[in-house]
């Protein structure tokens, strides 16, 4: 699903992010958010109880510290480039192995000058890949975060990645909720694997609906790799995500918009 998950952009948003469409009012806060599937960010050491053997020095990929360092540097350069003159305020990452690779990325790559902090999931995924969120503390004050486990369609089904829910404050003191998701892949066929993605989408939808009940004016962004297109059931029917209009007056509160819909 390379067409989808190599694109580093915001995939979903809810009003009132009108400022992203070009008009700024006195209370508007402009900041950049990036979603990026880094594709197998593994270090070269074995992570106990995880199936990461493909990314060890003696495996078929001959993965080693030098290759790992180069990948970190490449990821850092991409993130910096997306920010223009300033690094993005928030960066959602998919397919990161563990805390170790996140520490290396934030402290020992070109990102170290950006002073990012991060939170991530610790999912039961057998390969050990997770999702994470980088944030700049001067732009986003972390209040809380949690992992949301995704149900399995059958008891013997393979576990998948948790969904990351992060809550924080922007500079204008608005509460901001970020959900980072990496839906199950299409391995084995799109139709055969679809039930897994539908369950993940329902988990996200439940989390969003819950935020509607506790926030008067929820400001929610959903980021990640959904392994589906805008017209697929997980996006169109479960999440009910629509293509955004270029006219800000037509955007509705408590409505989910897919920023890539109609752009393929």
Residue positions per predicted region:
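Active-site metal-binding loops of divalent metal-dependent hydrolases
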Residues: 38, 96, 183, 225-226
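Bacterial Sec-dependent N-terminal signal peptides
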Residues: 1-28
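N-terminal, active-site-proximal structural segment of metallo-dependent hydrolase catalytic domains
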Residues: 20-115, 119-131, 201
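Sec-exported extracytoplasmic/periplasmic mature domains
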Residues: 80-87, 98-111, 139, 206-216, ...
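Loop/turn elements at helix/coil->beta-strand transitions in domains of secreted/extracellular proteins
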Residues: 29-32, 86-90, 113-116, 172-176, ...
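Metal-dependent phosphoesterases centered on the DNase I-like endonuclease/exonuclease/phosphatase
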Residues: 197-264
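Structured beta-strand-rich core segments of catalytic domains in phosphoester-bond hydrolases
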Residues: 96-176, 181-184
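Active-site His/acidic residue clusters
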Residues: 49-52, 178-196
């Amino acid at each position: 699903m390379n067409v989808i998950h190599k694109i580093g952009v915001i995939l979903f948003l809810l009003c009132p992010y009108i400022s992203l469409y070009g008009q700024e009012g006195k209370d508007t806060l402009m900041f950049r958010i990036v979603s990026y599937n880094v594709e197998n960010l593994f270090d070269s050491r074995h992570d106990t109880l995880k199936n990461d053997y493909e990314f060890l020095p003696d495996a078929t990929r001959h993965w080693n510290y030098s290759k790992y360092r180069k990948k970190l540097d490449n990821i850092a350069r991409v993130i910096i480039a997306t920010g223009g003159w300033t690094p993005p305020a928030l960066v959602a990452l998919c397919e990161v192995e563990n805390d170790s690779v996140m520490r290396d990325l934030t402290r020992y790559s070109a990102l170290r000058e950006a002073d990012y902090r991060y939170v991530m999931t610790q999912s039961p995924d057998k390969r050990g890949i997770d999702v994470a969120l980088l944030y700049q503390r001067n732009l986003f004050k972390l209040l809380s975060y949690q992992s949301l486990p995704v149900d399995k369609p059958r008891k013997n089904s393979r576990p998948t990645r948790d969904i990351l829910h992060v809550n924080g404050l922007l500079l204008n003191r608005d509460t901001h909720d970020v959900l980072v998701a990496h839906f199950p892949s299409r391995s084995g066929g799109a139709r055969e694997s679809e039930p897994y993605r539908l369950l993940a989408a329902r988990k996200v939808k439940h989390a969003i609906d819950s935020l509607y009940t506790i926030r008067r004016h929820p400001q929610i962004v959903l980021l990640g790799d959904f392994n589906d297109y805008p017209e697929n059931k997980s996006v169109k029917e479960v999440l009910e995500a629509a293509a955004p209009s270029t006219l800000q007056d037509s955007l509705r509160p408590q409505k989910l918009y897919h920023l890539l819909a109609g752009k393929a």
